Amino acid sequence: MSETVQIKAPWLASKDPEVPSTLNYSTLSMCGRVEEMVRQYPNYTAYEFMGKTTTYAEMWQKINACAKSLKAIGIREGDKVTICMPNAPQTLCMFYAVNMVGAIANM
């Protein structure tokens, strides 16, 4: 028999009533959620960096290319990959590519 546990959350008494007490999180993986955004909004801006905008579709192509390269060098599901890069679009693509192949990103 399943039992529901009520967790005390005293901070909820002082929150704005417009703010929900709980959130409905996606059941998709991180990459699955990005892929969903690509399908829904392919031509929307995913990010802007140094004056250049990149759409979700363009970003997804970069993530896939990076994931393909990771697989080519032998990165597999469950492997740990340390990402030591500056805050730049390439870091974002690498992070999602590592997750796409099922590896664990360590930053």
Labelled PLM ranges:
Residues 30:
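Conserved donor sugar-nucleotide recognition element shared by glycan-biosynthetic enzymes
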Residues 1-27:
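Flexible, non-catalytic linker and terminal segments flanking ANL/adenylate-forming cores
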Residues 99:
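Anion (oxyanion) recognition and catalysis
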Residues 26, 35, 43-96:
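Conserved AMP-binding/adenylate-forming core of the ANL superfamily
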